[in-house]
Amino acid sequence: MWYVKMYFSEKRELFQCDASGIQGVPSVDREFPFLESLLTFLEMDCGELTPILQRIADRWSRLIAEFDRDAGTEAMVELGQLKSRHIYLELLYVRWYDRFSRMGIYGDRGSAEDEQMLAELRDLPEQLLLYQKQVQRFFDLVLDVDSAGRDPQQQAAKNYLHDSPRDPSLFRFRPIPLSFEPVEPGRCSPVLYSASIPDMIDYSLRSCVERGITVRRCKNCGRYFPQTGRVSAEYCERPVPRGQQTCREAGAFQQWTKKQSDDPVFKAYRKEYKKRFAWIKAGRISDTDFYAWSERAREMKKKCDRDVITLEEYVEWLKNS
């Protein structure tokens, strides 16, 4: 029996998928930072998926109506390409692959299961957009620290009555298939055996509420990030292309630069440093003398930072050193 497993481990989320149902050696084994799958789903352009899903649905329809195996193969090829766009879409491939294989073995096309899967394919473009809107609304009212505050439990309790949202545009939680099993050496964890994309969305949202994790838009890139560390964090550590700085790294440098640019002691030091560095090219000072001076200038700057000497005394020293 096929499976799509999802579980959390500290600041990570892990997915394992297998169309044959073989435990321990899944065909897909992926790891992301915590909440990354939900955040990238929220950012995904679902409109691009609509024509692809429509083609897959048409080919699946021909398969179950006419037993057109070529159409079924074409549907599976497109599902295989589609799954590379997002980890949630792996579920479609695994589930449809399982059914396509069983259909070939037993020749039981046209079953109620096939019709249900066809209906799901046809409805999926609209459903994906709906899920995105519901997640965004949940962020606005429950998880976004800047609009909803720092207590997701309190906000969730305020916005839900029993198992129903007070606002119909909010995500609706339902029972999900959770297990509990070893996931790492010496450690067990709740594990979601997902039957649908909403299951994975549900598990991510409820886990944030249970763990008291809020989200915030990054001050640099504008994307959401989970506040798994300091709730005052303004810059994200979302994945970036190899060789690029994360927003948190870039933000720390920007903050340091701004702080230094507003510091009169640093400005005085920097002005004299640039002037004397230019003297090297002009031949007025040697490299050795320049670096010896800069070392003394930094020591004097530290004294000024500690108020051992005044700014005026430091500026005077720089001019006469």
Outline where the language-model segments fall.
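Extracellular/mature segments of secreted proteins
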Residues: 244-245, 255-257
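Short loop/turn segments at secondary-structure transitions that flank enzyme active sites
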Residues: 224, 242, 253
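Short helix-coil boundary/hinge micro-motifs
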Residues: 1-226, 256-257, 263-280, 284-287, ...
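Cysteine-rich micro-motifs
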Residues: 230-250
